[in-house]
A protein has these predicted regions:
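Proline-enriched interdomain boundary motifs that mark the N-terminal boundary
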Residues: 531-538, 621-628
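Solvent-exposed segments in extracellular or luminal domains encompassing
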Residues: 582-594, 676-686
């Protein structure tokens, strides 16, 4: 307090921080879910069982038609190096550079018709997953090609597969390492290539190892002479690659330079192989190694992976012992026929071999020449937890798994929208019409007699981000179908939801078993009681004293209507914020600074109670100083007062500040301007507070 004369005055001014009632909007985002999830590809007669990919069946997200498409597909993955060929390094070999620690050794598929599985699972997924997680590849953590082969070979000992089947299996069902499913290279005894390994929780274990997405470089991304609408060459063209720095190579080389390995198909029995020669001004480190200069025909369809490229390797395509235009550059590929073939299991494929028509003058003429690299694929693996811990477990017994179909349907209780997944597998082998007449039926364990299969399916394949709390937002149905009435029944032993978080199991069969033959059975959650639980949401996320906070109770399970109670717990004692009421949210100002806990108690109509707790920190808002712009003033002078405040809520502005002027026991209140300051002009002298 100051005493002032008639013209000079002192002051003591009080600034008070007011509160603002500005509740934020609560926005609920409906989860997008996968719709029917099936995989069906036609066998095109590839002799190694590697089937062509029909580009017309790929979604837009699975088609990569340019460097820009690849960049978008890669997202937050490996850093991109550029979008044009001149900006790319002249060579990259992911089997020998710093990424080589993720490469599995050259494998040997032997007599197993599973080249697509060795390409997609053994090489591509092992390398990509381990690189994503930063885990070096060892002989024990390689992912098994037999796991995906047995699930995709249609029950035929010479059954083929292709990339999309393998990638879909890994995306939805996961993968197992060779410790669980050895990478055998003989199809005998036949059970080893028919066994689905549906036992001992292996299917649930596999769900830890999945991929996020896959994409195919459509031919226009690297072969401009192709028309992907009809998936065939355009007769008038077919020579897109004319030099080592040709822009038509940019998409593939960008991916490889970013540390990727790429799956692809080729006709390996039609390769025209020669040896790399030496010449001045070229890379002579690989002289004497095998290089493919062209693909003569359509014999021996085979899946492999591209691991690198080198712009400075010379392939004497026309055999004239001179370096001619179009002869520079080659991709390095890894095969799955052991180290005895090629260059210790690797090969070089000349860039020119990608052309339908060679760019090299005097090149050998092949009447049915084919591109040496085709249907190139890439996969994306994110270092995250893929499994939701909420699964459908189903145990079946049959000698004819080909007749089995299983569907799971989630029906949103709010809007009755349906999300259906056809579990792949088991699937009916009639999906692969070309094998129907020659397939031998087997049990889930690959035997010719009836046997059990214990299978798991992650429910996030149906509803993304599902958990045990949100399971009750949907009505669930599981439909099991036995297609043929042939005297070979299907036994339904278990159908249940399993929650690994709590260890809970919710039986849809009521402890019974069922047998069907040529019919179906639907099981629902109508008689299943899921856990009654609650969660708490507090808004805003950063809380300050004097600020109004919205507290929302989120309830799962139980039977409506509900009663809600809100409390604040601090230092071992509780303060009632709102006694039991019908409102699932309340608005309160929390003036006790420090660490505390919001406690919400919910009762359902049956008297069941659940409690949810939310730890929070309330930041103390405090005015630490009030500074005038003048140390002395006279009556009639304007003085600007500026407050210094710590931990001020972001939503607060000048309307939250109030200033009080007191003189001779009489007080007058004023509001601040928008930037929290107060401008005061005294009309008389004296002592003022």
């Amino acid at each position: 307090m100051h005493h002032i004369g008639k013209r000079i005055f002192g002051f003591c001014l009080t600034a008070v921080l007011l509160t603002s009632v500005l509740p934020g909007a609560l926005i609920a985002n409906a989860a997008e879910a996968n719709t029917e999830n099936t995989a069906s590809q036609e066998n095109t007669g590839f002799s190694d069982g590697c089937e062509e990919v029909d580009f017309s069946t790929l979604s837009d997200d699975e088609r990569i038609s340019s460097v820009e498409d690849y960049m978008e597909f890669s997202g937050n993955g490996a850093p991109l190096v550029g979008s044009s060929a001149p900006s790319l390094p002249e060579e990259c070999d992911n089997s020998t550079n710093e990424n080589s620690i993720y490469c599995p050794p050259i494998g040997d598929q032997g007599g197993v018709y599973g080249c697509a599985c060795w390409s997609a699972t053994y090489y591509n997924y092992t390398y990509t997953a381990h690189r994503a997680y930063g885990i070096p590849t060892t002989e024990n953590n390689i992912f098994s090609p037999i796991w995906t082969y047995n699930l995709s070979n249609s029950g035929y000992i010479k059954g083929g597969s292709n990339g999309p089947r393998n990638y879909n299996i890994i995306r939805t069902m996961g993968a197992l390492t060779v410790e669980d499913v050895p990478a055998i290279n003989s199809p005998y005894p036949e059970q080893v290539v028919f066994d689905w390994h549906a036992e001992n929780g292996l299917w649930k274990k596999a769900l830890r190892n999945r991929l996020t997405s896959y994409g195919y470089f459509t031919p226009e991304a690297y072969v401009e002479g192709y028309n992907t609408d009809i998936n065939t060459p355009v007769p008038a063209t077919g020579t897109p690659v004319t030099s080592a720095d040709d822009s038509d190579l940019a998409a593939l080389k960008t991916a490889i330079s970013n540390g990727e390995v790429l799956g692809f198909n080729s006709f390996i029995y039609s390769w025209d192989e020669i040896k790399i020669k030496s010449a001045p001004g070229v890379d002579n480190r690989f002289v004497g190694e095998t290089v493919v200069r062209g693909c003569k025909d359509t014999e021996g369809g085979h899946g492999m992976v591209i691991v690198g490229y080198n712009d400075n390797i010379w392939t004497d395509i026309n055999g004239n012992n001179k370096v001619d235009s179009g002869e520079m550059g080659a991709f390095k590929i890894a095969n799955s026929w052991g180290t005895w073939n090629g260059n210790n299991g690797y090969y070089w494929i000349a860039y020119d071999a990608m052309n339908k028509v060679s760019a090299v003058s005097g090149a050998p003429s092949y009447p049915n020449r084919q591109p040496g690299i085709d249907t190139v694929s890439t996969i994306k693996v994110e270092p995250k937890k893929y499994e939701s811990d909420v699964y459908l477990k189903y145990v079946l017994k049959s000698s004819e798994r080909a007749n089995t179909h299983v569907y799971v349907t989630a029906i949103n209780k709010a809007d009755r929208s349906e999300y259906v997944s056809k579990l792949v597998p088991p699937y009916g082998l009639d999906d692969y019409a070309n094998y129907v007449d020659i397939v031998e039926d087997h049990s889930y364990r690959g035997t010719v007699t009836a046997d059990y299969g214990e299978m798991y399916y992650d429910l996030n394949n149906v509803i993304p981000d599902i958990d045990i709390a949100s399971l009750n937002d949907y009505d669930w149905e599981v439909k099991v179908v036995d297609k043929t009435n042939n005297g070979k029944p299907l036994s339904i032993i278990e159908v249940k939801f399993v929650d690994d978080t709590t260890g809970g199991e919710y039986d849809l069969l009521d402890g019974k078993t069922y047998t069907i033959n040529g019919s179906s059975k639907v099981f629902s959650t109508s008689n299943v009681t899921f856990p009654f639980s609650a969660d708490v949401k507090v808004s805003p996320s950063s809380i300050h004293t004097l600020e109004e906070v919205r507290i929302t109770a989120l309830t799962k399970g139980g039977n409506a209507p509900f009663k809600y109670q809100f409390e604040l717990e601090k230092d071992g004692s509780k303060t009632m914020l709102e006694p039991f009421c019908n409102n699932f949210e309340c608005y309160k100002r929390l003036n006790a600074a420090g660490d505390c806990t919001i406690v919400v108690t919910v009762k359902d109509t049956d008297g069941n109670t659940t409690v949810a707790r939310k730890p929070i920190t309330v930041n103390q808002t405090k005015i630490t100083a009030l500074t005038p712009d003048k140390a002395n003033a006279s009556v009639g002078d304007s003085i600007v007062f500026t407050p210094q405040v710590t931990n001020l809520a972001p939503s607060f502005d000048g309307t939250n500040f109030r200033y009080t002027v007191t003189k001779d026991g009489v007080s007058e209140q004023f509001f601040a301007d928008f930037d929290k300051r107060f401008v005061w002009t005294p009309e008389e002298g004296g002592t003022t507070l």
